[in-house]
C-alpha cells in the first residue's frame, strides 16, 4: 500500500506519544474500536519502537507508522519494529536516501513552497504539512493548491477537534494528524472507553 492509499483510509491520524509500552495495545484497540485504524507513534520516548512492535503483533486491524524520523538511522529502527509507514517533520537528501532503502512508504514533512518543490522533485506528492497552524494553516494550504495541483497534504500541528473540519474541507487535504486523541491523563488512568469516544467523534469528521 502506498502512502496516498494509507492516508485515504482515515480522516484523522492519531499522533501518539507512548511513554509506557503497556499502554500500546489497549490504546490501539480503543482507537480502532472508535474507527481510527491508521496510527502514528512518534519517536519521542524510549517506549516508542517497542510499542509499535507490540501493536503490530497484537492489533492486526490497524496500520501503524513511526513519526519524528529525523535521522537516517531512525529508518532502520522503525523497519525492525515493523512500521508500515514513516513520517518526517522535514526532508533532507540524507533522509530521502534512507527512505529509498526502507521497507515502508514515507510521508515527508514540508512547510514552505520551496520545500514542497524539493519533496516533489524527490518523488513525493503526498506530504505532511507541519507545523500546520503556526505555518499558516488553512490559508497557506489554499495558497499552495494553485501552484501544486498534484500535491496532497496531511496537515499536522496545532489542529484541534474544532478546526479539523476546516482543513478536511480543502480539496488538497487527504487527512489531518491529531494529537488530541490520546490525552496524557486518559492514558495514565487507562480510560480506554474515553479514548474510543474521542476516536468515534474524530471519525465522524470524515471528508464529504
Region locations from a protein language model:
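Conserved N-terminal beta1-alpha1 strand-loop-helix module at the mouth
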Residues: 1-85, 101, 150, 161-162, ...
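Histidine/lysine/aspartate-rich catalytic loop segments that bind and position anionic ligands
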Residues: 92-126, 130-135
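Short beta-strand segments at enzyme active-site cores
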Residues: 39-42, 65, 88, 109, ...
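Mobile acidic interaction elements
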Residues: 135-137, 142, 147, 163, ...
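Shared catalytic-loop signature of beta/alpha-barrel
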Residues: 118, 139-160
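Glycine-rich phosphate-binding active-site loops on the catalytic face of alpha/beta enzymes
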Residues: 85, 89-95, 128-138, 172-194
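Glycine-rich beta-to-alpha transition loops that act as phosphate-gripper elements at the mouths
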Residues: 17-21, 66-72, 88-92, 108-113, ...
